[in-house]
Regions:
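Ubiquitin-like/PB1-type beta-grasp interaction modules and other compact soluble beta-rich domains
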Residues: 1-81
């Protein structure tokens, strides 16, 4: 098992009630797998699961990217501006 820190921003904090979550994950888990696990633990995230954006160690990451050991993950809603 691998430990990761998941930092949550904006509305994702509202859905979970947390700023940061430490999780144990299996080796080889992807961002998509982590999102699925987060929805199991925090069902209020389900409606926004597909739109959650991610970063690994402060760099944007795709859903297919495998999580490295002891990674810091950031999840945030899509950002738009005007």
């Amino acid at each position: 098992m691998n430990k990761v820190k998941v930092y949550l921003f904006a509305t994702l904090r509202d859905y979970t009630g947390k700023k940061m979550i430490e999780m144990e994950i299996p080796a080889g888990m992807t961002i998509a797998g982590l999102k699925t696990q987060m929805v199991k633990d925090y069902p209020k995230l389900a409606p926004v699961q597909e739109s959650i954006m991610a970063a690994i160690n402060r760099e944007y990451a795709s859903d297919e990217q495998i999580l490295p050991l002891d990674a810091e993950i950031a999840f945030f809603p899509p950002v738009s501006g005007g």
